[in-house]
Amino acid sequence: MYDNALHIRHLGKQDYESVWHAMQHYTDNRDENSQDEIWIVEHTPVFTQGQAGKSEHILNPGDIPVIQVDRGGQVTYHGPGQLVVYPLLDIKRLKVGVRQLVTHIEQSIINMLKRYQIEAYAKADAPGVYVEERKIASLGLRIRKGCSFHGLALNVDMDMSPFQRINPCGYAGMEMIQCKQLGGPQTVEEAGAQLIETLSQELGLDKLVHHQGLPESYE
């Protein structure tokens, strides 16, 4: 039974594909009684190519796997030291439109960075969050049956060199930046704790229930 809470799942370090398939499974099997969940994870190195992605934007993947996925957007990189957050929300029940959800997610990142005196902003024509024209967070969602999956990636303290092997989000020469360079949160755990606060505030959901690991049936 839906309990009007936001269930936060702390997944730790996980490979991309197992988490992707688990969130597909969760979304496909939801009904009006399913909980709204947010999954927090750090992925092993991977390039993911969204539905709008073009192969020419993957310049030189080397030994990092490339996975074609069912989210919006183009190619991005996930790796250790990056906070990845997947909001699995019934947006119909929350009475939130898709564009509104994107705005809530972007604003929650902006509000979180503001706590560290970092001035970040969104761009109308290029989803994500930016600081001084450099990208600090990427965003790519999918809506199925009125429910969201996939989500956001915030660069915290990571090896940024793999971004040079792609045109991030399809933009040649797009410069990336991370929290550590700016005096922001120094660990994925710190960033995750802060972002859950600002994201739940943006969504108007103040009852939080924390869990460790994937739902049992999806492990």
From Swiss-Prot:
CC per GO annotation: cytoplasm
Domain BPL/LPL catalytic: 32-207
List of catalytic residues: 169 (acyl-thioester intermediate)
Site positions for Lowers pKa of active site Cys: 135
Subcellular location: Cytoplasm
EC number, UniProt record: 2.3.1.181
Lineage: superkingdom: Bacteria
Record field: catalytic activity: octanoyl-[ACP] + L-lysyl-[protein] = N(6)-octanoyl-L-lysyl-[protein] + holo-[ACP] + H(+)
UniProtKB keywords: Acyltransferase, Cytoplasm, Transferase
Protein family per UniProt: Belongs to the LipB family.
Protein's recorded name: Octanoyltransferase
Originating organism: Shewanella pealeana (strain ATCC 700345 / ANG-SQ1)
Origin organism lineage: Bacteria, Pseudomonadati, Pseudomonadota, Gammaproteobacteria, Alteromonadales
Name of the gene this protein is made from: lipB
